């Protein structure tokens, strides 16, 4: 029996987490613009000292997970999921093909969804066989 990452279900759940992230940001900071620096490290807006709430805790956890990706992974993830840019546009900016961006997006999405606990896996009935 083989266990495989379910891309479609995980992407759906991750998009809900991204929507929650944007909503929490709006509630706490009263703005929809996501803050990140030139290295695509997510951060809280400067000059805000929000109370310690469940929303703030979620924002900080989300930022920590995304910021744990490589610089390239962060940029692809933020541009794809938070800024909703197309693979073609991201590829033009980073000088990669659309297909290369798609592969990088999938890898970043898989890492983030696993770390946030929203990844879905499925079992296949394929039997693994070893060949000599």
Give names to the regions the model predicted.
Residues 83-100:
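Helix-turn-helix DNA-binding module
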Residues 104-107:
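Residues within the DNA-recognition helix of helix-turn-helix
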Residues 80:
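Cytosolic nucleotide-binding catalytic cores of signal-transduction proteins
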Residues 76-77:
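A short pre-motif secondary-structure segment
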